[in-house]
Amino acid sequence: MAKKALVNKANKKPKFAVRAYTRCQRCGRPHSVFRKFGLCRICVREMAHAGELPGVHKSSW
């Protein structure tokens, strides 16, 4: 889990737009965040396996 101070810092509007970055809404992870879901890859995988993301299923070939 991310520190609360870092999550609060990410939620504030930065002085310059290029400084803004996405964080996972569930765990606060700053890297590998899917914009479509607002979640990191780890949370997307866990929630997809649990069936908590509608329209998403595990592919196999």
Curated annotation (Swiss-Prot):
Binds 1 zinc ion per subunit. GO terms for cellular component: cytoplasm; small ribosomal subunit. One of its GO terms (biological process) is translation. Pfam families: Ribosomal_S14. Its cofactor is Zn(2+). Zn(2+) binds at residues 24, 27, 40, 43. Keywords: Metal-binding, Ribonucleoprotein, Ribosomal protein, RNA-binding, rRNA-binding, Zinc. InterPro entries: Ribosomal_uS14, Ribosomal_uS14_bact, Ribosomal_uS14_CS, Ribosomal_uS14_sf. GO terms for molecular function: rRNA binding; structural constituent of ribosome; zinc ion binding. NCBIfam families: PRK08061.1 (NF005974). Part of the 30S ribosomal subunit. Contacts proteins S3 and S10. Belongs to the universal ribosomal protein uS14 family. Zinc-binding uS14 subfamily. PANTHER family: 30S RIBOSOMAL PROTEIN S14 (PTHR19836), SMALL RIBOSOMAL SUBUNIT PROTEIN US14M (PTHR19836:SF19). Binds 16S rRNA, required for the assembly of 30S particles and may also be responsible for determining the conformation of the 16S rRNA at the A site. This is Small ribosomal subunit protein uS14. The gene is rpsZ.
